[in-house]
Each structure stands twice: as structure tokens, then as C-alpha cells.
Amino acid sequence: MILKRISILNYKNLEQVELNFSAKLNCFFGQNGMGKTNLLDAVYFLSFCKSAGNPIDSQNIRHEQDFFVIQGFYEAMDGTPEEIYCGMKRRSKKQFKRNKKEYSRLSDHIGFIPLVMVSPADSELIAGGSDERRRFMDVVISQYDKEYLDALIRYNKALVQRNTLLKSEQPIEEELFLVWEEMMAQAGEVVFRKREAFISEFIPIFQSFYSYISQDKEQVGLTYESHARKASLLEVLKESRVRDKIMGYSLRGIHKDELNMLLGDFPIKREGSQGQNKTYLVALKLAQFDFLKRTGSTVPLLLLDDIFDKLDASRVEQIVKLVAGDNFGQIFITDTNREHLDRILYKVGSDYKMFRVESGAINEMEEKER
């Protein structure tokens, strides 16, 4: 899938933006806070029906405005044009349309335009709680497996209902707990099996990317932990019910799964330097891209937001070689350092566009300005 053109009104600090893109490489440079990340976030929104950084849609509307609109004009691998529209008014439900037809469920759109974003916010994958790492698995698997996304939605709905019962100060019949526990167990087993299969296939791809970027200087790994591996999920939930009632929420289940991120045999959260952490995160996301490309019917879009920060020159050079190669499709990349972008452009050749970003205004540079 190629994003040919984007139209943006009142999204974050972007008042009005109309841009045509290169099918290969699109570079955005400017100082921090000018709107580079917001442009990438608008592209992300068109794939995931939400912002990468702010889940509250109304807070993405430009200050003192009542709405935002994002429109993307794409071209599929077979040349078919696709138009995606998102509109949001304050105090109203957002609209999401494909070729002018509104989706009845936003989840039906997930995976239609596969996308991988690498950004500074990824540091939470290492530094943050286990929910960040579960979200990483969810974002990847949901883009190629509708059954997974449906099971995850069912599980979370049942989890909310069970937690409501656990908080109740009134006596609750066991049969009522069983209704939701059986739903959690059924959906949770699907989620567990698919997470386990994904991680098994993903690990060697991830290790290969890390090895290339670091030039074999360190070994890395991933391990997946789940209550569903230890026993039947239904039995786990039933056995935990008394303690859960005391706490007022569900202590066990696939919503507590963990993805351990390792440098050697130890948690990278504890052992990794800034450069090793950044290398780990970039390798994770590039492996995510490669995995989605292998499993899907279309090449994902790749968004790279300020990825060279905290990396030494040799690792920057390895990443430049990767993204300039033929393995990746359409790329959107931001940086405050024009030299980083110039090094990539030198390797890519002529198929690129360069944009200058200043105070929410984005302008394509003429060839003589580049």
C-alpha cells in the first residue's frame, strides 16, 4: 500500500496541510515541536483509527477549533485507489470511512493499511509496565489476524464485567461469575495460542535485525509468560476468585501476560545502556515490519520518528543501510539533523521527497533547495 496524498485540517498543531508523497522515501526536517511527529501521527491515525500518542480523540483537535479531518489517498499493490477519511467534532463520535462508506466497526479497518512506527515513545516498551509489551504484541498480531482481534475484544469485555462483579458489595451467585469466566477462558485461550505462535516465529527475525545493527556485539532474546501456560485458564480464574474479590479486580489471566526483553540472560531494563536500549527498540520495530510483510498481502508503511538519537555512528550507519535497501516499501522519516537524512538520500538515489516543517506548516522543498 502506498500513501499518495494526505489532506489534514486542524489536527494537533497542523492547521491545513496538503502533501503529495514519494512512493519510496519522504523526509521531514525541522526543530523539535514544529509538527514533524504530528504529521506521522496523522498517517498513523489513518491505519489504526486513533493517535499513537493520545487516545482521547477530542484532545487531538487543534486549539480553538471544533473539529479535525484527516484524508489519505492510497494506491493498493494492484493499482486500485483507496480513500480513507477520518473526521472528529467535539462532543461527537468520530467518523471513519473507506471510499466514502462508513465503517460499522472500527476494528474492521485494522490491518487494511499495515503500518509500523518507530518513535521515542517506544522507550516505554522497556521502561514501562507489562501492559506496554502486551500492546506491542496486540498491535502486530491484530494487523494480520482478525480472529485474534475479535478474541481480544471479547476477552476485555468479559474482564470488565467480571471486575464489576468483584467490586460488588452484594453477594453474587457463582453462576454469574462462571458466565464471564467461561467467556474469558474461551477468548483468552485463543489470544494465548496466537501470542505464543507469534513470539516463537518473531524471535529469530528480531535477533537477526539486532545482530546486524549492533554488528554482533551483543545477544538479545524474548520470553513470553502467561497464566494460560500453567493450567486451564478457566481453572486459573476460578481458583483466583476469592483473592480477586478481596482485591476488587482480576489478578490472573492473559491481561497479565508478560513479554520479557533480555540482553544476554538479563532484563535489558536493568542492564542496557541508552544505545543498547535504542538498538533493541529499533530492531524490534524493524522485525515487526518484516514479520507483517511476510504474513500479509501488502507491504506495510514504515514511519521513523527521530530514530538516530542516542546511537553511535556505526549503528546509525547500519540502520541507514537497512532502510535505504529494497526490503522496505514507503518510508516516512523525521529528524532535526539534516545530515542524517542526507546520508540516507545519498544511498537511496532519486526517488525521494524532502519537506521542511516550521510551526505547523509543512512545505515540500524544490529540487534546487535540497
Swiss-Prot record:
Its main location: cytoplasm. GO terms for molecular function: ATP binding; single-stranded DNA binding. One of its GO terms (biological process) is SOS response. One of its GO terms (cellular component) is cytoplasm. PROSITE patterns: RECF_1, RECF_2. SUPFAM superfamilies: P-loop containing nucleoside triphosphate hydrolases. Transmembrane segments: none annotated. The keyword DNA repair applies. Keywords: ATP-binding, Cytoplasm, DNA damage, DNA repair, DNA replication, DNA-binding, Nucleotide-binding, SOS response. Disulfide bonds: none annotated. ATP binds at residues 30-37. It is found in: Cytoplasm. Belongs to the RecF family. The RecF protein is involved in DNA metabolism; it is required for DNA replication and normal SOS inducibility. RecF binds preferentially to single-stranded, linear DNA. It also seems to bind ATP. This is DNA replication and repair protein RecF. It comes from Bacteroides fragilis (strain ATCC 25285 / DSM 2151 / CCUG 4856 / JCM 11019 / LMG 10263 / NCTC 9343 / Onslow / VPI 2553 / EN-2). The gene is recF.
